[in-house]
């Protein structure tokens, strides 16, 4: 099951090439913003799994091309990035030096969003 936020941070599940909204199925999770909603769902996922699976089966949802997919964590606390963290196609004798940098949490965008 692939969870995602879409449009105005509605919670959804990816079903084939469609997005099925599930916010109404988890609205009793105490939250004032999307970050709390997804954290509450993850924390109590086993309590909601059957309800979500049943709700997703009964809906076709919206084509993913017709919704705006949003960042998975609307307000992350910290983002640590690795510039190189793998052996490039087997052509290196040894791993590249570790190059770590941080990004501001306000720099998170969703797929196909414009970076400013």
Residue ranges of model-derived segments:
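Glycine-rich, charged/polar anion/phosphate-binding loops
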Residues: 113-116
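Structural signature of FAD isoalloxazine-binding scaffolds in flavoprotein oxidoreductases
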Residues: 94-111
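N-terminal non-catalytic cap/leader segment that marks the start of a structured domain
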Residues: 1-98
